[in-house]
Amino acid sequence: MQLLTIGINHHTAPVALRERVAFPLEQIKPALSTFKDIFLGRTARTAPEAAILSTCNRTELYCATDDHAAREAAIHWLSEYHNIAIDELAPHVYALPQSEAVRHAFRVASGLDSMVLGETQIVGQMKDAVRTATEAGALGTYLNQLFQRTFAVAKEVRTTTEIGAQSVSMAAAAVRLAQRIFDKVSNQRVLFIGAGEMIELCATHFAAQQPRELVVANRTAERGQRLAESYNGRAIPLSELPTRMHEFDIIVSCTASTLPIIGLGAVERAVKARRHRPIFMVDLAVPRDIEPEVGKLEDVFLYTVDDLGAIVREGNASRQAAVAQAETIIETRVQNFMQWLDARSIVPVIRHMHTQADALRRAEVDKAQKMLARGDDPAAVLEALSQALTNKLIHGPTHALNRASSENRDQLIELMGGFYKHAHPSSER
Protein backbone atom coordinates (compact mmCIF):
# COMPACT_ATOMS: atom_id res chain seq x y z
CA MET A 1 0.00 0.00 0.00
CA GLN A 2 1.17 3.51 -0.88
CA LEU A 3 0.31 6.66 1.05
CA LEU A 4 -0.87 9.68 -0.91
CA THR A 5 -2.19 13.11 0.01
CA ILE A 6 -3.74 15.44 -2.53
CA GLY A 7 -5.24 18.82 -1.78
CA ILE A 8 -5.34 22.57 -2.07
CA ASN A 9 -4.77 25.11 0.69
CA HIS A 10 -4.27 28.81 1.38
CA HIS A 11 -0.72 28.57 -0.02
CA THR A 12 -1.80 27.21 -3.41
CA ALA A 13 -5.30 28.54 -4.07
CA PRO A 14 -7.38 31.68 -3.38
CA VAL A 15 -10.54 31.50 -1.32
CA ALA A 16 -12.61 31.77 -4.52
CA LEU A 17 -11.36 28.30 -5.54
CA ARG A 18 -11.08 26.80 -2.05
CA GLU A 19 -14.76 27.40 -1.39
CA ARG A 20 -15.67 25.44 -4.53
CA VAL A 21 -13.59 22.44 -3.43
CA ALA A 22 -14.78 22.46 0.19
CA PHE A 23 -16.81 19.51 1.53
CA PRO A 24 -19.73 20.31 3.83
CA LEU A 25 -19.75 17.88 6.75
CA GLU A 26 -22.86 16.06 5.54
CA GLN A 27 -21.21 15.34 2.16
CA ILE A 28 -18.01 13.76 3.44
CA LYS A 29 -19.30 10.22 4.09
CA PRO A 30 -21.02 9.93 0.67
CA ALA A 31 -17.90 11.41 -0.96
CA LEU A 32 -15.67 8.80 0.69
CA SER A 33 -17.98 6.08 -0.59
CA THR A 34 -17.78 7.30 -4.20
CA PHE A 35 -14.01 7.68 -3.92
CA LYS A 36 -13.62 4.05 -2.82
CA ASP A 37 -15.92 2.88 -5.64
CA ILE A 38 -13.82 4.69 -8.24
CA PHE A 39 -10.70 2.77 -7.22
CA LEU A 40 -12.42 -0.60 -6.95
CA GLY A 41 -13.65 -0.07 -10.50
CA ARG A 42 -10.06 0.36 -11.65
CA THR A 43 -7.05 -1.88 -11.04
CA ALA A 44 -6.95 -1.68 -7.24
CA ARG A 45 -6.99 -5.10 -5.60
CA THR A 46 -8.45 -3.73 -2.38
CA ALA A 47 -10.54 -0.70 -1.46
CA PRO A 48 -8.39 2.32 -0.62
CA GLU A 49 -8.29 3.80 2.84
CA ALA A 50 -9.32 7.46 2.78
CA ALA A 51 -10.07 10.51 4.92
CA ILE A 52 -11.14 14.02 3.92
CA LEU A 53 -10.00 17.11 5.82
CA SER A 54 -11.98 20.20 4.80
CA THR A 55 -11.50 23.52 6.61
CA CYS A 56 -11.52 27.22 5.76
CA ASN A 57 -7.91 27.02 4.65
CA ARG A 58 -7.60 23.57 3.08
CA THR A 59 -9.29 20.61 1.47
CA GLU A 60 -7.15 17.47 1.61
CA LEU A 61 -7.68 13.83 0.75
CA TYR A 62 -5.46 11.37 2.63
CA CYS A 63 -5.43 7.87 1.19
CA ALA A 64 -3.62 4.53 1.19
CA THR A 65 -3.98 2.44 -1.95
CA ASP A 66 -2.26 -0.21 -4.05
CA ASP A 67 -3.25 1.61 -7.27
CA HIS A 68 -0.07 3.00 -8.85
CA ALA A 69 -2.08 5.53 -10.85
CA ALA A 70 -3.77 6.86 -7.72
CA ARG A 71 -2.46 10.41 -8.09
CA GLU A 72 -4.14 11.09 -11.42
CA ALA A 73 -7.28 9.17 -10.44
CA ALA A 74 -7.69 11.11 -7.18
CA ILE A 75 -7.23 14.51 -8.82
CA HIS A 76 -9.74 13.64 -11.55
CA TRP A 77 -12.18 12.41 -8.91
CA LEU A 78 -11.89 15.71 -7.01
CA SER A 79 -12.40 17.62 -10.24
CA GLU A 80 -15.47 15.62 -11.26
CA TYR A 81 -17.00 15.56 -7.77
CA HIS A 82 -16.99 19.35 -7.55
CA ASN A 83 -17.68 19.89 -11.25
CA ILE A 84 -14.51 21.93 -11.76
CA ALA A 85 -12.55 21.64 -14.99
CA ILE A 86 -9.35 19.66 -14.45
CA ASP A 87 -7.31 22.38 -16.20
CA GLU A 88 -8.64 24.92 -13.72
CA LEU A 89 -8.07 22.78 -10.63
CA ALA A 90 -4.84 20.90 -11.34
CA PRO A 91 -2.40 23.87 -11.17
CA HIS A 92 -3.47 24.49 -7.56
CA VAL A 93 -3.34 20.87 -6.39
CA TYR A 94 -0.42 19.30 -4.56
CA ALA A 95 0.10 15.54 -4.63
CA LEU A 96 2.37 14.14 -1.92
CA PRO A 97 3.42 10.46 -1.94
CA GLN A 98 4.77 8.33 0.90
CA SER A 99 7.19 10.24 3.18
CA GLU A 100 6.02 13.59 1.78
CA ALA A 101 2.44 12.72 2.77
CA VAL A 102 3.59 11.72 6.26
CA ARG A 103 5.66 14.90 6.70
CA HIS A 104 2.74 17.01 5.51
CA ALA A 105 0.30 15.43 7.97
CA PHE A 106 2.73 16.00 10.85
CA ARG A 107 3.29 19.64 9.82
CA VAL A 108 -0.42 20.34 9.41
CA ALA A 109 -1.34 18.95 12.84
CA SER A 110 1.56 20.82 14.45
CA GLY A 111 0.32 24.13 13.08
CA LEU A 112 3.33 24.67 10.81
CA ASP A 113 1.23 24.78 7.65
CA SER A 114 -1.54 26.96 9.09
CA MET A 115 -2.25 30.57 8.24
CA VAL A 116 -1.98 31.18 11.99
CA LEU A 117 1.38 29.59 12.81
CA GLY A 118 1.05 27.16 15.71
CA GLU A 119 -2.75 27.34 15.95
CA THR A 120 -4.38 24.42 17.74
CA GLN A 121 -7.81 24.33 16.08
CA ILE A 122 -6.48 22.19 13.23
CA VAL A 123 -5.85 19.21 15.54
CA GLY A 124 -9.52 19.07 16.46
CA GLN A 125 -10.47 19.40 12.80
CA MET A 126 -8.18 16.50 11.88
CA LYS A 127 -9.65 14.37 14.67
CA ASP A 128 -13.13 15.14 13.34
CA ALA A 129 -11.98 14.05 9.87
CA VAL A 130 -10.65 10.77 11.28
CA ARG A 131 -13.87 10.18 13.22
CA THR A 132 -15.99 10.76 10.11
CA ALA A 133 -13.80 8.46 8.00
CA THR A 134 -14.00 5.77 10.68
CA GLU A 135 -17.79 6.01 10.78
CA ALA A 136 -17.82 5.73 6.97
CA GLY A 137 -15.72 2.55 7.13
CA ALA A 138 -12.98 4.23 5.09
CA LEU A 139 -10.08 3.93 7.53
CA GLY A 140 -7.74 0.95 7.85
CA THR A 141 -4.40 -0.05 9.32
CA TYR A 142 -2.26 2.43 7.39
CA LEU A 143 -4.22 5.65 7.87
CA ASN A 144 -5.12 4.74 11.44
CA GLN A 145 -1.45 4.44 12.23
CA LEU A 146 -0.62 7.62 10.30
CA PHE A 147 -3.15 9.71 12.20
CA GLN A 148 -2.29 8.26 15.61
CA ARG A 149 1.36 9.13 14.97
CA THR A 150 0.26 12.53 13.65
CA PHE A 151 -1.55 13.44 16.85
CA ALA A 152 1.37 12.22 18.96
CA VAL A 153 3.82 14.35 16.95
CA ALA A 154 1.58 17.41 17.23
CA LYS A 155 1.48 17.00 21.00
CA GLU A 156 5.27 16.60 21.15
CA VAL A 157 5.84 19.72 19.05
CA ARG A 158 3.49 21.85 21.12
CA THR A 159 4.87 20.70 24.47
CA THR A 160 8.58 20.94 23.62
CA THR A 161 8.68 24.11 21.47
CA GLU A 162 7.26 27.65 21.64
CA ILE A 163 5.46 27.25 18.33
CA GLY A 164 2.17 28.58 19.71
CA ALA A 165 3.62 31.44 21.76
CA GLN A 166 2.63 35.02 20.91
CA SER A 167 0.57 33.91 17.93
CA VAL A 168 -1.84 36.35 16.32
CA SER A 169 -5.13 34.53 15.80
CA MET A 170 -7.64 35.22 13.06
CA ALA A 171 -9.96 36.61 15.75
CA ALA A 172 -7.30 39.00 17.04
CA ALA A 173 -6.51 40.03 13.46
CA ALA A 174 -10.18 40.88 12.92
CA VAL A 175 -10.10 43.21 15.94
CA ARG A 176 -6.91 44.87 14.67
CA LEU A 177 -8.52 45.53 11.30
CA ALA A 178 -11.63 46.95 12.96
CA GLN A 179 -9.41 49.32 14.93
CA ARG A 180 -8.02 50.62 11.64
CA ILE A 181 -11.52 51.53 10.47
CA PHE A 182 -12.94 52.83 13.75
CA ASP A 183 -11.06 54.86 16.34
CA LYS A 184 -12.73 52.93 19.15
CA VAL A 185 -14.44 49.57 18.92
CA SER A 186 -16.11 50.48 22.21
CA ASN A 187 -18.35 52.92 20.32
CA GLN A 188 -19.54 50.33 17.79
CA ARG A 189 -22.34 47.80 17.57
CA VAL A 190 -21.05 44.32 16.68
CA LEU A 191 -23.04 41.51 15.04
CA PHE A 192 -21.81 37.91 14.91
CA ILE A 193 -23.45 35.56 12.43
CA GLY A 194 -23.07 31.92 13.46
CA ALA A 195 -22.25 30.37 16.82
CA GLY A 196 -19.39 27.97 16.12
CA GLU A 197 -15.89 27.86 17.52
CA MET A 198 -14.50 30.62 15.28
CA ILE A 199 -17.34 33.01 16.11
CA GLU A 200 -16.88 32.26 19.81
CA LEU A 201 -13.17 33.15 19.52
CA CYS A 202 -14.03 36.38 17.73
CA ALA A 203 -16.68 37.24 20.31
CA THR A 204 -14.09 36.80 23.06
CA HIS A 205 -11.68 39.24 21.40
CA PHE A 206 -14.30 41.84 20.51
CA ALA A 207 -15.96 41.61 23.93
CA ALA A 208 -12.61 42.54 25.48
CA GLN A 209 -12.92 45.90 23.64
CA GLN A 210 -16.29 46.49 25.37
CA PRO A 211 -18.36 47.39 22.28
CA ARG A 212 -21.55 49.39 22.68
CA GLU A 213 -23.58 46.28 21.81
CA LEU A 214 -22.84 42.64 21.01
CA VAL A 215 -25.46 40.66 19.10
CA VAL A 216 -25.54 37.07 17.78
CA ALA A 217 -27.65 35.84 14.86
CA ASN A 218 -27.72 32.08 14.41
CA ARG A 219 -29.84 29.51 12.61
CA THR A 220 -30.33 27.64 15.90
CA ALA A 221 -31.86 30.23 18.23
CA GLU A 222 -31.00 28.42 21.47
CA ARG A 223 -27.31 28.15 20.66
CA GLY A 224 -27.17 31.77 19.54
CA GLN A 225 -28.89 32.90 22.74
CA ARG A 226 -26.46 30.92 24.88
CA LEU A 227 -23.43 32.45 23.16
CA ALA A 228 -24.84 35.98 23.37
CA GLU A 229 -25.62 35.68 27.08
CA SER A 230 -22.09 34.52 27.86
CA TYR A 231 -20.86 37.94 26.63
CA ASN A 232 -23.72 40.01 28.05
CA GLY A 233 -25.17 40.38 24.58
CA ARG A 234 -28.45 39.51 22.94
CA ALA A 235 -29.57 37.21 20.14
CA ILE A 236 -31.74 37.85 17.10
CA PRO A 237 -33.25 35.38 14.61
CA LEU A 238 -31.18 34.85 11.48
CA SER A 239 -34.30 35.57 9.44
CA GLU A 240 -34.24 39.20 10.64
CA LEU A 241 -30.77 39.79 9.23
CA PRO A 242 -31.83 41.55 5.97
CA THR A 243 -33.90 44.14 7.84
CA ARG A 244 -31.58 44.62 10.85
CA MET A 245 -28.16 44.75 9.19
CA HIS A 246 -28.08 48.56 9.08
CA GLU A 247 -28.03 48.65 12.89
CA PHE A 248 -24.49 47.28 13.08
CA ASP A 249 -21.09 48.86 12.46
CA ILE A 250 -19.12 45.60 12.60
CA ILE A 251 -20.35 42.28 11.18
CA VAL A 252 -18.40 39.03 11.55
CA SER A 253 -19.79 35.94 9.82
CA CYS A 254 -18.74 32.29 9.89
CA THR A 255 -21.43 29.70 9.20
CA ALA A 256 -21.48 26.30 7.52
CA SER A 257 -23.81 27.47 4.76
CA THR A 258 -22.94 26.23 1.28
CA LEU A 259 -24.34 29.44 -0.26
CA PRO A 260 -23.89 33.13 0.67
CA ILE A 261 -26.33 34.33 3.32
CA ILE A 262 -25.59 38.05 2.81
CA GLY A 263 -26.22 39.35 -0.68
CA LEU A 264 -25.26 42.55 -2.45
CA GLY A 265 -28.79 43.95 -2.41
CA ALA A 266 -29.21 43.56 1.35
CA VAL A 267 -25.93 45.36 2.04
CA GLU A 268 -26.79 48.14 -0.42
CA ARG A 269 -30.02 48.76 1.50
CA ALA A 270 -28.14 48.70 4.81
CA VAL A 271 -25.59 51.27 3.57
CA LYS A 272 -28.38 53.53 2.37
CA ALA A 273 -30.21 53.25 5.71
CA ARG A 274 -26.97 54.11 7.52
CA ARG A 275 -26.57 57.21 5.35
CA HIS A 276 -23.20 55.88 4.21
CA ARG A 277 -21.64 55.44 7.62
CA PRO A 278 -19.01 52.71 7.12
CA ILE A 279 -19.65 49.02 7.78
CA PHE A 280 -16.73 46.73 8.63
CA MET A 281 -17.43 43.15 7.54
CA VAL A 282 -15.34 40.02 8.13
CA ASP A 283 -16.20 36.80 6.28
CA LEU A 284 -14.39 33.87 7.89
CA ALA A 285 -16.46 31.18 6.17
CA VAL A 286 -15.40 28.86 3.36
CA PRO A 287 -17.55 28.72 1.25
CA ARG A 288 -18.04 32.46 1.81
CA ASP A 289 -21.09 33.81 3.64
CA ILE A 290 -20.95 37.24 1.98
CA GLU A 291 -21.15 37.75 -1.76
CA PRO A 292 -17.72 39.04 -2.90
CA GLU A 293 -19.34 41.89 -4.88
CA VAL A 294 -20.21 43.49 -1.53
CA GLY A 295 -16.56 44.47 -1.16
CA LYS A 296 -16.88 46.83 -4.15
CA LEU A 297 -19.42 49.03 -2.39
CA GLU A 298 -18.31 52.38 -1.05
CA ASP A 299 -18.45 52.62 2.74
CA VAL A 300 -18.13 48.83 3.06
CA PHE A 301 -14.84 47.31 4.21
CA LEU A 302 -15.05 43.57 3.52
CA TYR A 303 -12.26 41.18 4.51
CA THR A 304 -11.96 37.41 3.98
CA VAL A 305 -9.78 34.78 5.64
CA ASP A 306 -7.08 35.43 3.05
CA ASP A 307 -7.06 39.16 3.84
CA LEU A 308 -6.66 38.47 7.55
CA GLY A 309 -3.81 36.11 6.75
CA ALA A 310 -1.51 39.03 5.90
CA ILE A 311 -1.90 40.43 9.42
CA VAL A 312 -1.45 37.00 10.96
CA ARG A 313 1.80 36.44 9.07
CA GLU A 314 3.29 39.60 10.57
CA GLY A 315 3.51 37.78 13.88
CA ASN A 316 5.01 34.60 12.45
CA ALA A 317 8.56 35.84 11.83
CA SER A 318 9.39 36.09 15.55
CA ARG A 319 8.85 32.35 16.03
CA GLN A 320 11.22 30.97 13.41
CA ALA A 321 13.49 29.37 16.04
CA ALA A 322 10.51 27.36 17.29
CA VAL A 323 9.71 26.39 13.70
CA ALA A 324 13.23 25.03 13.23
CA GLN A 325 12.92 22.96 16.43
CA ALA A 326 9.55 21.63 15.32
CA GLU A 327 10.86 20.69 11.87
CA THR A 328 13.69 18.69 13.48
CA ILE A 329 11.23 16.75 15.64
CA ILE A 330 8.98 16.11 12.65
CA GLU A 331 11.82 14.87 10.45
CA THR A 332 12.85 12.32 13.08
CA ARG A 333 9.26 11.11 13.47
CA VAL A 334 8.83 10.86 9.69
CA GLN A 335 11.83 8.52 9.53
CA ASN A 336 10.36 6.44 12.37
CA PHE A 337 7.04 6.14 10.58
CA MET A 338 8.66 5.19 7.28
CA GLN A 339 10.55 2.40 9.07
CA TRP A 340 7.20 1.10 10.32
CA LEU A 341 5.76 1.42 6.81
CA ASP A 342 8.70 -0.47 5.29
CA ALA A 343 8.26 -3.22 7.86
CA ARG A 344 4.56 -3.45 6.96
CA SER A 345 5.46 -3.96 3.29
CA ILE A 346 7.13 -7.31 4.03
CA VAL A 347 4.23 -8.67 6.09
CA PRO A 348 2.47 -10.20 3.03
CA VAL A 349 5.75 -11.87 1.98
CA ILE A 350 6.29 -13.32 5.45
CA ARG A 351 2.67 -14.47 5.57
CA HIS A 352 3.06 -16.18 2.18
CA MET A 353 6.30 -17.87 3.30
CA HIS A 354 4.60 -19.12 6.45
CA THR A 355 1.58 -20.41 4.52
CA GLN A 356 3.78 -22.18 1.99
CA ALA A 357 6.00 -23.75 4.66
CA ASP A 358 2.96 -24.89 6.62
CA ALA A 359 1.48 -26.50 3.51
CA LEU A 360 4.74 -28.43 3.00
CA ARG A 361 4.74 -29.48 6.64
CA ARG A 362 1.15 -30.76 6.49
CA ALA A 363 1.84 -32.70 3.28
CA GLU A 364 4.88 -34.45 4.78
CA VAL A 365 3.11 -35.15 8.08
CA ASP A 366 0.26 -36.79 6.13
CA LYS A 367 2.78 -39.00 4.34
CA ALA A 368 4.43 -39.91 7.63
CA GLN A 369 1.10 -40.82 9.23
CA LYS A 370 0.26 -43.11 6.31
CA MET A 371 3.67 -44.80 6.62
CA LEU A 372 3.11 -45.34 10.34
CA ALA A 373 -0.40 -46.67 9.70
CA ARG A 374 0.93 -49.39 7.44
CA GLY A 375 3.48 -50.42 10.06
CA ASP A 376 6.73 -48.81 8.87
CA ASP A 377 9.52 -48.40 11.40
CA PRO A 378 8.89 -45.12 13.35
CA ALA A 379 12.59 -44.18 13.29
CA ALA A 380 12.70 -44.57 9.51
CA VAL A 381 9.49 -42.57 9.16
CA LEU A 382 10.94 -39.70 11.24
CA GLU A 383 14.15 -39.77 9.22
CA ALA A 384 12.21 -39.64 5.94
CA LEU A 385 10.03 -36.81 7.30
CA SER A 386 12.98 -34.69 8.36
CA GLN A 387 14.85 -35.30 5.09
CA ALA A 388 11.81 -34.36 3.00
CA LEU A 389 11.20 -31.17 5.00
CA THR A 390 14.86 -30.18 4.72
CA ASN A 391 14.95 -30.72 0.96
CA LYS A 392 11.73 -28.86 0.28
CA LEU A 393 12.46 -25.91 2.59
CA ILE A 394 15.88 -25.24 1.05
CA HIS A 395 14.75 -25.89 -2.52
CA GLY A 396 13.66 -22.27 -3.08
CA PRO A 397 16.87 -20.62 -1.79
CA THR A 398 19.19 -23.07 -3.60
CA HIS A 399 17.21 -22.66 -6.82
CA ALA A 400 17.54 -18.86 -6.52
CA LEU A 401 21.30 -19.16 -5.94
CA ASN A 402 21.78 -21.40 -8.96
CA ARG A 403 19.83 -19.06 -11.24
CA ALA A 404 21.36 -15.81 -9.95
CA SER A 405 23.79 -13.88 -12.13
CA SER A 406 27.36 -13.60 -10.88
CA GLU A 407 26.87 -9.99 -9.77
CA ASN A 408 23.76 -10.85 -7.74
CA ARG A 409 25.06 -14.14 -6.37
CA ASP A 410 27.47 -12.57 -3.86
CA GLN A 411 24.67 -10.46 -2.44
CA LEU A 412 22.40 -13.50 -2.17
CA ILE A 413 25.14 -15.51 -0.46
CA GLU A 414 25.63 -12.72 2.07
CA LEU A 415 21.91 -12.46 2.75
CA MET A 416 21.45 -16.22 3.11
CA GLY A 417 24.52 -16.41 5.28
CA GLY A 418 22.78 -14.08 7.65
CA PHE A 419 19.58 -16.11 7.50
CA TYR A 420 21.27 -19.39 8.29
CA LYS A 421 24.01 -17.91 10.49
CA HIS A 422 26.77 -19.21 8.22
CA ALA A 423 29.93 -17.27 7.50
CA HIS A 424 30.61 -15.94 4.01
CA PRO A 425 32.94 -18.37 2.19
CA SER A 426 35.56 -15.65 1.69
CA SER A 427 35.85 -15.16 5.46
CA GLU A 428 36.83 -18.77 6.11
CA ARG A 429 40.49 -19.55 6.63
From Swiss-Prot:
GO molecular function annotation: glutamyl-tRNA reductase activity; NADP binding
UniProt pathway annotation: Porphyrin-containing compound metabolism; protoporphyrin-IX biosynthesis; 5-aminolevulinate from L-glutamyl-tRNA(Glu): step 1/2
InterPro entries: 4pyrrol_synth_GluRdtase, 4pyrrol_synth_GluRdtase_dimer, 4pyrrol_synth_GluRdtase_N, GluRdtase_CS, GluRdtase_dimer_dom_sf, GluRdtase_N_sf, NAD(P)-bd_dom_sf, Shikm_DH/Glu-tRNA_Rdtase
Gene3D superfamilies: Glutamyl-tRNA reductase, N-terminal domain, NAD(P)-binding Rossmann-like Domain
PROSITE patterns attached to this UniProt entry: GLUTR
Origin: domain of life: Bacteria
Site (Important for activity): 104
EC number(s) from the headed UniProt entry: 1.2.1.70
GO biological process: protoporphyrinogen IX biosynthetic process from glutamate
Pfam short name (any one): GlutR_dimer
Residues that bind substrate: 55-58, 114, 119-121, 125
Record-listed NADP(+) binding positions: 194-199
Enzyme class: oxidoreductase
Active site: 56
Keywords: NADP, Oxidoreductase, Porphyrin biosynthesis
Annotated catalysed reactions: (S)-4-amino-5-oxopentanoate + tRNA(Glu) + NADP(+) = L-glutamyl-tRNA(Glu) + NADPH + H(+)
Miscellaneous section: During catalysis, the active site Cys acts as a nucleophile attacking the alpha-carbonyl group of tRNA-bound glutamate with the formation of a thioester intermediate between enzyme and glutamate, and the concomitant release of tRNA(Glu). The thioester intermediate is finally reduced by direct hydride transfer from NADPH, to form the product GSA.
Subunit structure: Homodimer.
Function description: Catalyzes the NADPH-dependent reduction of glutamyl-tRNA(Glu) to glutamate 1-semialdehyde (GSA).
Annotated domain remarks: Possesses an unusual extended V-shaped dimeric structure with each monomer consisting of three distinct domains arranged along a curved 'spinal' alpha-helix. The N-terminal catalytic domain specifically recognizes the glutamate moiety of the substrate. The second domain is the NADPH-binding domain, and the third C-terminal domain is responsible for dimerization.
Family: Belongs to the glutamyl-tRNA reductase family.
NCBIfam families attached to this UniProt entry: hemA
The protein's name: Glutamyl-tRNA reductase
Originating species: Paraburkholderia phymatum (strain DSM 17167 / CIP 108236 / LMG 21445 / STM815)
Gene this chain is encoded by: hemA
